A protein has these predicted regions:
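Cofactor-binding loop segments of dinucleotide-utilizing enzymes, especially the Rossmann-like FAD-
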Residues: 17, 39-40, 120, 146, ...
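Adenine nucleotide phosphate-binding catalytic loops in nucleotide-utilizing enzymes
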Residues: 10, 15-17, 55, 79, ...
Length: 287
């Protein structure tokens, strides 16, 4: 397992740019790694690559050379949008070169705890509300992921006093090796991104990577109304907190037509929830 302190003098390939690739490249460069960036966009039309070259980072643009990995890279950080069947990614895996995404890199270098939110629907709203509530309570949250600043950008400024609230896609979670949020949240699970993952099973496996490294000292909040989610949750080693909107439950978070409950005890009336719609009631469960 690579730790951030081990990245100095390591040869690292960043595959694909956009915001996440730029942030990962800059962070790795600051940590003393020997960084090479490879992006399909031609250099002349690639201001991100031009900016990285100006900082002393090696840039290869316009194509993905078949022999690229012959340079002896010890780690590949790929853009989440690049699939694992990409020839370079597949070749790296065959060579036993670790392949991670920017989220995993951010986790390796950050001193702050993470609250990770994923799901097919509702994750953006949930991430935003959690961030706003922590901010209102002066908890110094930082928002990252698919909304806000990319993960590596946030990790560079985070301290142990911060909490990183991060929205996570299945693309990002496929690259999990050590990522372990203090609190993991799964809002729901429906067919999505099958063009990328191939099957619902592969998509679900990626989503449940959010809890794969958690221990009983961590928390996994999940949608107990969905059988597939319950089956996966049973495999988690985290302290599990189920939620249901199908009536009062003695375990976890629940709701009926009038009230919200915690372990069977009423905590407030549904009528005080300003956001309308059943999906927003479920989003409130995570707070």
């Amino acid at each position: 397992m690579i730790q951030y302190k081990d990245l100095q003098f390591k040869k690292v390939l960043v595959l694909g740019l956009a915001k996440s690739g730029v942030a990962a490249s800059e962070l790795l460069h600051e940590l003393g790694a020997f960084v090479t960036v490879n992006d399909a966009k031609p250099f002349d039309a690639n201001p991100e690559a031009q900016g990285l070259l100006a900082k002393g980072i090696t840039v290869i643009c316009g194509k993905h050379p078949e022999d690229l990995l012959d340079e002896g890279f010890e780690l590949v950080v790929k853009n989440p949008g690049i699939p694992y069947f990409n020839p370079i990614v597949a070749d790296a895996i065959r060579r036993d070169i670790p392949v991670i995404t920017e989220v995993e890199l951010a986790y390796l270098v950050s001193e702050a705890p993470f609250i990770g939110i994923t799901g097919s629907n509702g994750k953006t709203t949930t991430t935003t509300i959690i961030h706003e509530m922590l901010a209102a309570d002066n908890k110094a949250p930082l928002i990252a992921g698919n909304i806000g600043t990319v993960s590596c950008g946030v990790a560079r400024e985070a301290t142990p006093e911060n909490t990183i609230v991060i929205e996570l896609s299945s693309f990002q979670l496929m690259g999990v090796r050590t990522f372990k949020p203090k609190i993991a949240i799964l809002t729901n699970l429906f067919d999505a991104h099958l063009d990328y993952h191939g099957t619902f099973q592969a998509y679900a496996d990626a989503k449940f990577n959010i809890t794969s490294n958690q221990t009983e000292e961590d928390y996994f909040i999940y949608n107990a109304d969905q059988e597939v989610v319950r089956e996966y949750a049973a495999k988690s080693n985290a302290t599990k907190i189920p939620f249901t909107s199908k009536g009062r439950s003695e375990i976890g978070i629940s709701a009926d037509d009038t009230s919200i409950y915690w372990n069977g005890d009423k905590i407030f009336d549904r009528s005080i929830i300003v956001l309308r719609g059943q999906y927003n009631v479920e989003n409130i469960f995570f707070l």
